């Protein structure tokens, strides 16, 4: 995984300025870490997934763009494909099957 929590935080705050959306990202990060702990999965990876799941939303709120734009950025930055898939699958309009525990938790 080509990220740390600090790098993910920088990415989030680069794209997201609204306090409400940042609080949402932090809450989802915490929830995902708790789910990862329960499932004995990688808490850092799951937390970063939660932190970044809507990072592109403020700049790309239309369903044709979110989370596609964010997924493209994450792929270019070297984030794992399972995380990118979970982020895409969390958006109902993408109509992607939620297969993994990460997909379902997010």
Segments (PLM) and residue ranges:
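General structural signal for secondary-structure boundaries
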Residues: 1-4, 101-103
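Electropositive phosphate-/nucleotide-binding environments in soluble metabolic enzymes
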Residues: 2-6, 22-26, 40, 64, ...
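Generic N-terminal amphipathic, Lys/Arg-enriched alpha-helix
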Residues: 3-18
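Predominant activation on well-ordered alpha-helical scaffold segments within soluble catalytic domains
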Residues: 9, 13, 26-29, 33, ...
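Alpha-helical phosphate/pyrophosphate-handling elements in metalloenzyme active cores
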Residues: 17-44, 58
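Divalent metal-dependent catalytic cores for phosphoryl transfer on phosphate-bearing substrates
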Residues: 39-106
